[in-house]
């Protein structure tokens, strides 16, 4: 009799353990599906900035990053607190915040030597500083506050893409005024309206493509974003590339700015390769969650490259000024600062359009339910 009872108890225990394992398996599968189940627990309050990927909805996850996620729907204050914690966004926030501070201090030094109120030749440099500062500041903000809600996450990165597009345009403007060939054979470099129109179109198209990639072409979103911004980089820096390729004077062929420009291009190329391939975390998921993931390389290398870009432009601004002032076009408020403002407004309008589209989709989903 005792033997039978023990057998029954053992069988019951085995069945109970199997049922628990089955429920746990179902829980993990539901978590990975991207839908938060009623039983989904975000853990203790001290762990809300270091959650595993299966405890956050799918749209808050990054490929091959397994830990270090913040609890979705946190407040702005909690987002600020998370910047001092060990989460997978910490380095993204601080890398570009430090870069923003560096560019701001350096620009103050440069502009103190070239008063823009008295020197219109400094206008393109101001545009570049505005674009660069906006890019770094919006990047930090997007990575800091993207866990507040699903819609906030999309809007944060919409503005991040817009800031990158404005930066690229401002860089193109500065490269045209400071680094273009002195005697270009290409028609587009002899016509500033044509060049700046192309840069404007590229800015708007790249922003629209990146915003759309958050809802379409999800499987190729990193390639789309990296590809559009790399194309924008080559178009906006084309005055310098053509100048190096077809230099016709000692000033163009032996410019002191060339090493800085080449180094910037190298840093940007490595950053694009890492971001597009998702290396190294693709090879060892979970190892580089806090430090060393591809987006960290993107942030840090782009920051260093942009500093080199700043140096290259400033050296050309100083060394080529006399020759450029004899050319057919020179900077004015209208063709530099005002034009950058127009492009900025156009990019903000695109962001607002995509933001409204999110609201419309949410409303449609609620009506269906």
PLM feature spans:
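Multi-pass alpha-helical transmembrane bundles in non-GPCR membrane proteins
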Residues: 2-369
